[in-house]
């Protein structure tokens, strides 16, 4: 199942990704809930249709955050749908972060090699923490007054996150 989520004013369900249908009239502004779209069609056309439903607040330079997987790993998003989406989103490129655990993606050099092996070389892939981290203030934060983020995140105006459910521990 392809799941797409975004914050917005209404909660809609896509029953058919080719011709999306609104199934709910619940107001997310009142309930502070995110929109969640589902599709059983995992294809470039489906992902682009879902993106087109939520892209009204995505602007400027766009980071498309993906999980690129370990070398030759089985848990990799289908590259053809990511490639189609990236080509559809103006002024976008893929972004990723190095892993906290030791492995193929622990260093930027190792990560770049893994990107090539796994076929993520069809566009620029920025390693967000390649130049370290930066502390940003959290306005009105209840638990944190500042947070550490990957420094290269400051180079983007919007971020679209594509992920998969892994079901494994770190």
Cite the ranges covered by each PLM segment.
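N-terminal and secondary-structure boundary signal
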Residues: 7-170
């Amino acid at each position: 199942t392809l799941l797409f989520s975004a914050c917005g004013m209404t909660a809609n369900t896509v029953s058919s990704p080719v011709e999306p249908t609104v199934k709910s009239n619940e107001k997310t502004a009142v309930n502070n809930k995110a929109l969640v779209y589902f599709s059983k069609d995992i294809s470039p056309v489906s992902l682009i249709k879902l993106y087109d439903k939520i892209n009204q607040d995505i602007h400027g330079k766009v980071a498309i955050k993906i999980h690129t997987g370990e070398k030759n790993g089985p848990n990799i998003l289908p590259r053809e749908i990511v490639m189609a989406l990236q080509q559809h989103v103006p002024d976008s490129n893929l972004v990723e972060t190095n892993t906290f655990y030791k492995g193929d993606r622990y260093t930027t050099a190792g990560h770049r090699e893994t990107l090539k092996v796994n076929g993520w070389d069809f566009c620029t892939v920025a390693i967000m923490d390649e130049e370290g981290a930066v502390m940003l203030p959290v306005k009105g934060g209840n638990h944190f007054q500042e947070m550490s983020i990957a420094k290269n995140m400051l180079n983007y105006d919007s971020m679209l996150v594509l992920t998969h459910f892994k079901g494994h521990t770190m």
